[in-house]
Design a protein with these regions (language model features):
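Bacterial N-terminal signal peptides that target proteins for export
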Residues: 1-11
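C-terminal motif of bacterial Sec signal peptides marking the signal peptidase cleavage site
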Residues: 18-21
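Bacterial signal peptide processing site
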Residues: 23-25
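Conserved positions within compact, well-structured domain cores
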Residues: 28-235
Length: 235
């Protein structure tokens, strides 16, 4: 009888260890949920956690929704006339927010804001206060501390980013929206929250194709691009 009790205790212990081990392995593969959305820990130096999917997407390979920089709603047309922070003055569109250069602002307007405020951050607006858009510095960290492999998932091309800990995220080549068209779907173009201060009409983006990958500051704020959210909050 004592032997049977001992065997039972051992078996129960093994079952507990096995179940705990499975749960841990599952988290490594699928990510961890924060406010109903999954993040993946890529082992980055800053500890920044990257979302598994784009804003508006259900799966990693889905493109998701497109937003002008600093806007939190989708729309049918992406141009300067429809852009939230532009006003037509004399013969060109001028900025009325996120401007450090008087020559670019309406009537010489400047506010010296160079990073999106929380109310203009679509990741926070859509997913809650524990999520936000990445900065240009965080895109650089991502690029420098992961392998970027061009691949295909379920017929969608993009980059598989793998961190030093073996965890990965997939970022599809989404293209961008200009006027009422989706164009350049062989490119991945993802907004950061950082203004391009040398060119006020643009903001920094992660840009990649099947050959190159870099952080680019030439994409105009009025065009529609996708967003991959980040978090610094571990459950």
């Amino acid at each position: 009888m004592r032997f049977i009790k001992t065997i039972s205790v051992v078996l129960i212990t093994l079952v507990i260890v096995f179940v705990i081990g499975c749960k841990k392995e599952k988290n490594n593969v699928t990510g961890v949920v924060v406010e109903h959305h999954e993040y993946v820990d890529l082992g980055l130096p800053s500890g920044t956690l990257w979302a598994k999917c784009n804003i508006g997407a259900d799966n990693p390979e889905d493109f998701g929704d497109y937003f002008a920089w600093g806007e939190t709603k989708t729309k049918d047309v992406y141009d300067w006339k429809q852009y939230k922070y532009s006003v037509f003055e004399e013969d060109s569109y001028k900025l009325n927010k996120y401007c450090t250069d008087p020559s670019c602002g309406v009537g010489g307007f400047v506010d010296n804001l160079t990073v999106l405020e929380s109310g203009d951050d679509v990741a926070r607006a859509e997913w809650g206060e524990n999520w936000r858009m990445p900065t240009s510095e965080e895109f650089n960290e991502l690029y420098q501390n992961t392998t970027f492999v061009w691949t295909e998932i379920n017929g969608v091309y993009g980059r598989l980013l793998t961190g030093s800990n073996g965890n990965s995220i997939f970022m599809p080549a989404t293209g961008f929206r200009l006027d009422d068209q989706l164009i350049c779907t062989g490119l991945g173009v993802y907004w950061s929250s950082s203004l391009q201060t040398d060119c006020q009409v643009a903001a920094w983006s992660l840009h990649f194709d099947d050959v190159n990958c870099h952080v680019c500051g030439t994409y105009e704020r009025s065009r529609g691009q996708v967003v991959r959210a980040v978090s610094n909050n571990r459950p």
